[in-house]
Amino acid sequence: MLSIIFHRNVARTIGVASLIFVSCSNFSSNQDPWTSLEPLPLDPAIEAQIDEILPKLSLEQKVGQVIQADNASISAEDVKKYRLGSVLSGGNSAPGPLPYADAESWIEMADAFYMASIDTQGVEIAIPLILGIDAVHGHANLEGAIVFPHNIGLGATNNPDLIKEIARITAHELTVSGHDWTFAPTLAVPQDLRWGRSY
């Protein structure tokens, strides 16, 4: 008796799996493949500038350009020595002992990193670094800045004008603190609701 029940369950499972496979196969075949996307056209002026700069960089500089260090673990001297391409102000890594700092402290740090990155001592050419930060819902590491709800909450408002205004305010606060780049907006598709950005 158990053998018959087992075989029926196996047969049902195979049948359901076959239906799912056929459904998924048909679904994916109706989708436009990513390969149909065309890359953006190259800008000849930018390409010429790249062709001029690359031969002037040492191997060490080229390696440094693809490294992003966290500002809490490096100094301006490190930026110059290793010719870093970017510095991340990661979570809770503001200048100083606190997880946030005032605009003056941020600018002092940003300027020190920038000046170190453009120092041409010992190299033919220097490339300015990019200072990045996680400001997905406001500049939480800037004293006095506005921190907004996370993107999932903002999306739930269904108000693109509000979200645009929040982005404008965040961009202003990042500029005031010397940052060039934020890792935002984010489109998160969590597979596990325990992940912090799923709320």
Language-model segment annotations:
Residues 2-14:
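Bacterial N-terminal signal peptides that target proteins for export
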